[in-house]
Amino acid sequence: NTEFAELKIRDKIFKLPILKASIGQDVIDISKVYSEADCFTYDPGFMSTASCRSTITYIDGDQGILRHRGYDIKDLAEKSDFLEVAYLLIYGELPNNKQYNDFTKKVAHHALVNERLHYLFQTFCSSSHPMAIMLAAVGSLSAFYPDLLNFFKEADYELTAIRMIAKIPTIAAMSYKYSIGQPFVYPDNSLDFTENFLHMMFATPCEKYKVNPVIKNALNKIFILHADHEQNASTSTVRIAGSSGANPFACVSTGIASLWGPAHGGANEAVINMLKEIGSVENIPKYIAKAKDKNDNFRLMGFGHRVYKNYDPRAAVLKETCKEVLKELGQLDNNPLLQIAIELEAIALKDEYFIERKLYPNVDFYSGIIYKAMGIPPQMFTVLFATARTVGWMAQWKEMHEDPEQKISRPR
């Protein structure tokens, strides 16, 4: 039996259906408010608005819960690899051995990009930001793969998702190599997804890169933790672009552009800069006071989240992962950024100012320290975020095209 909410406008009462969620909050259907009541709803930033039906990711920000297709993010980070999670997001279930092997082979098969794409990279200045290069390169893929400009059946959606998941890491590594003046390194299909990415990032034609298993496992976890996160800014951008029928390469390029914003994907670089500014553990109280001062421009980066009003479950995984990486590299006891971060977190979590405002460490707080220890420069942080989030973008894009209720997005 359908329940209704009542909306009174002037002297007339309108009944709005209450849609039952499979988990989480119920939703009031306002889709007919304009046609029946001649009014629009106003919700800046979509703070209370659900834009679609989705079964991919669930977040309970009050409890600090993140699940993909019903699986807890901590379990996935500890027990799965990135392509298993990619399969889960796209198809709705974890793969069996045959499905996993077939999927990984398809991804490896499509990792190579058209050789002519190399010429596009040469048009950029050597000082160009890798995100700028990546944005242009991904958008240009529609010129190299015109067979996916028109898609009509499920097989097209699957091929598109696989191609995108396969080629984005190659383009990400190429963007880095070009920015530092090194030759491109081709994908190696004998390596798994994460190993191959590290190989393309750090190998050179004259020197092979030996993948440290601790580094590989850490990057695998980072990719899993960044794979999808409901209808965030970049995912919503991909869905809105996709609602017009735009080709998937164009859609993902819009997601990359949105992710590049400092309030979205650039926060972990800001955390590193903040920790450097603080400089030492002794300076933390001074900067805590600055963060509380509304007249001071200093902001405590890596704390707080639009959705989470509890400890971000991804941050908890990354805190331990950070310690594992630094221990492997012999930096656990002498890394100044980690020492500042741990002490800053400890002080903030006991401070009433932060407790009252529910400001807890988020996923960006420790990820930058891990990247830096791996030898990944700050300008590449958001590129790696995009590499992981491509999986979520494609799962959401595929779900949108398979949803009969979806229309072209047109806010008023």
Swiss-Prot record:
CDD domains attached to this UniProt entry: EcCS_like (cd06114)
Catalytic activities: oxaloacetate + acetyl-CoA + H2O = citrate + CoA + H(+)
Any Gene Ontology biological process: tricarboxylic acid cycle
EC number: 2.3.3.16
Any single Pfam family the record assigns to this protein: Citrate_synt
Gene Ontology molecular-function annotations: citrate (Si)-synthase activity
Residues annotated as catalytic: H305, D364
Coiled coil regions in record: none
Keyword terms: Transferase, Tricarboxylic acid cycle
The protein's annotated pathway: Carbohydrate metabolism; tricarboxylic acid cycle; isocitrate from oxaloacetate: step 1/2
Protein name, per record: Citrate synthase
Organism: Rickettsia bellii
Gene: gltA
